[in-house]
Design a protein with these regions (language model features):
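Glycine-rich nucleophile elbow surrounding the catalytic serine of serine-hydrolase chemistry
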Residues: 211-221
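A catalytic-pocket lid/entrance helix-loop region that shapes and gates access to the active site
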Residues: 221-223, 228-344, 481
């Protein structure tokens, strides 16, 4: 399909289709006409913003507001939606308290309320250990280069997950764990909808959620624990099994790579040097040689992922390590990592990774190997995942734990108690969300080094098995895989796409997405400005046989 420009026009409520006017029976997002009229008389937007603190009806919550006048420059001067509409920024703290560790806690949130409200509400998910408030004036958390939802007229909220700071030290406080698992998202969504109703005089007509990584997990929290809150959810690279699976895989991968890494003068391993960039490029090129043509054309992308049966043994040196081959140890480590972690009985503990050329991209190295030239590693498996493991995922926390000594038979059990409230992999029916008419988009990069796309596909296939098959399940949930994309973005991929507009079209116009238009940004190194259709799983983008490989119009979605 041909590329279409992303929408940047602000959409006013008067332009909304009639389908957005929900019956009052849908309490999660139905409108109500009681309260002040909008817009305020004489354009008194700033005064309305100031008055929101006094008019709000939120117990146990402190609020502050500031008004941003129209045509203010966006932070950083980003090209997409560089100038903002007039809007009221609300910062709030829910249930401020002192934790058992003596630290101050509260569920923080930021809500932007545009003057040109289009009747829609968007919750933007967080990520990592959270602990910061995402700027609600920026693009959605799932794809860079897309229009600012605030600029389009959405009321937009974000939360810090119930603590301040990006480390997982909050894990010492039991309530902070609960807040980060699910409670902060519930409280933020309820508070935001109440403030929207107070400010505009009616509730949102439609409510949407968009998040990636931890934000994708948060989206799944809503689909399972609070299924009436959102009409549609985008769960990008969802961390559905972060504590019970992906973190186990991160330890497995780190141990495998560290074991073959060269040593410094003191005998300490230098993790980043287990594979050079040239080594990873060698592997990526071999993956392309083996699998690229299966989608009908050699274009540097492996779109027919199910047909890719790459074996790194083809790269093994017959003798000493050389530039055009891998050592026996390197082949063994790659084989182990891509197969996924197992215990001593051979039981799989998490999905393996798909073979994809994106493994040579900086985003893959940043998570798995890092770039430190010393024995102090900087891979995100260590700096982020180990921090979460020892502080939050283990019950009780174990601050002296050595990740290189992770026991794959016994240590997963230490994570089970928290996984029960944190992970979102067990509910593979989503009955309540489906019955209320909710729509769900999974979007996942094929070269995500932390949350395997295979794990998302496995969940989706179980979801389909419990809902009458793929065709029936596509009535409310669809999965889109992005060849080459690393974790949420990056890699040799068409990683810019507008999932929010896709949700809006599905919910408000009844247009179920068979494809999502995607493009590579002009600054992308590998394939600048390339366009592709992202195809609803199990289909993939297949070359038609003619036309430029840079143009989405040369491809069609196919299951074989």
């Amino acid at each position: 399909m041909p590329s279409t420009p992303l929408r940047t026009r602000a959409v006013r409520r008067a332009a909304l289709p009639a389908a957005v006017l929900l019956p009052l029976a849908l309490a999660a997002c139905g409108g109500s006409n009681d309260g002040p009229m909008w817009p305020p008389a004489n354009g008194a937007y700033s005064a309305a913003c100031t008055g929101l603190v006094a008019n709000a009806k939120l117990a146990g919550t402190t609020l502050a507001t500031s008004y941003v006048p129209p045509d203010s420059k966006r932070p950083g001067g980003a090209a997409t939606g560089a100038f903002l509409p007039g809007h009221c920024v609300v910062t709030g703290s829910i249930n401020p308290r002192v934790g058992v560790d003596g630290k101050n806690y509260a569920i923080g949130f930021q809500l932007s309320l545009p003057d040109n409200w289009n009747g829609r509400f968007l919750f933007v998910g967080g990520g990592g250990n959270d602990g910061i408030l995402r700027d609600t004036s920026l693009s959605s958390s799932i794809s860079g280069g897309t229009p600012s939802p605030l600029g389009q007229g959405f009321a937009v909220v974000s939360t810090d997950g119930g603590h301040i700071g990006t480390t997982a030290s909050f894990g010492a406080d039991p309530q902070a764990r609960i807040d980060h698992a699910y409670n902060s998202y519930d409280k933020t969504a309820v508070s935001a909808k109440s403030l929207i109703a107070t400010h505009y005089g009616r509730k949102p007509d439609r409510s949407y959620f968009s998040g990636c990584s931890g934000g994708g997990r948060q989206g799944m929290v809503f689909s399972q624990r609070f299924p009436d809150y959102f009409d549609a959810i985008t769960a990008g690279a969802p961390a559905m099994r972060v504590s019970s699976g992906a973190t186990v895989a991160a330890m497995w991968n780190t141990i495998a790579f560290n074991a073959i890494a060269p040593q410094d003068a003191s005998g300490n391993r230098i993790l980043s040097q287990a594979f050079s960039n040239a080594d990873l490029n060698l592997v990526a090129n071999a993956v392309k040689s083996s699998c690229d043509a299966a989608d009908g054309v050699v274009d540097g992308m492996v779109s027919n992922t199910k047909a890719c049966k790459f074996n790194p043994a083809v790269l093994q040196c017959s003798g000493a390590k050389a530039a055009d081959c891998l050592s026996t140890a390197q082949v063994g480590a790659l084989t182990k990592v891509f197969a996924g972690p197992r215990n001593s009985a051979g039981q799989a503990l998490y999905a393996g990774q798909p073979w994809d050329p994106g493994l040579a991209a900086p985003g893959w190295r940043a998570w798995t190997l890092g770039s430190s030239t010393t024995a102090t590693p900087d891979a995100r498996y260590i700096t982020l995942m180990v921090d979460a493991l020892i502080n939050e995922f283990f019950t009780p926390p174990d601050l002296t734990f050595n990740p290189l000594a992770f026991n794959f038979d016994t240590d997963p059990a230490r994570m089970a108690a928290y996984s029960a409230i944190y992970d979102t992999y067990a509910d593979d029916k989503l009955t309540a969300f489906r019955q209320r008419g909710g729509k769900l988009l999974f979007i996942h990069g094929m070269s995500d080094p932390i949350f395997s796309a295979n794990d998302t596909v496995d969940y989706y296939e179980r979801l389909a098995a419990n809902n009458g098959g793929i065709a029936n399940t596509q009535g409310f949930a669809r999965t889109f895989l992005v060849p080459g994309m690393n974790h949420c973005s990056g890699g040799p991929a068409t990683d810019s796409f507008d999932s929010i507009q896709t949700m809006v079209d599905w919910v408000e116009k009844g247009i179920a997405p068979d494809t999502i238009a995607a493009k590579a940004l002009p600054t992308q190194v590998d394939y600048p400005n390339r366009t592709r259709p992202l195809c609803a799983y199990p289909q993939f983008a297949k070359y038609k046989g003619t036309g430029s490989v840079e143009d989405a119009g040369s491809f069609v979605c196919s299951a074989q």
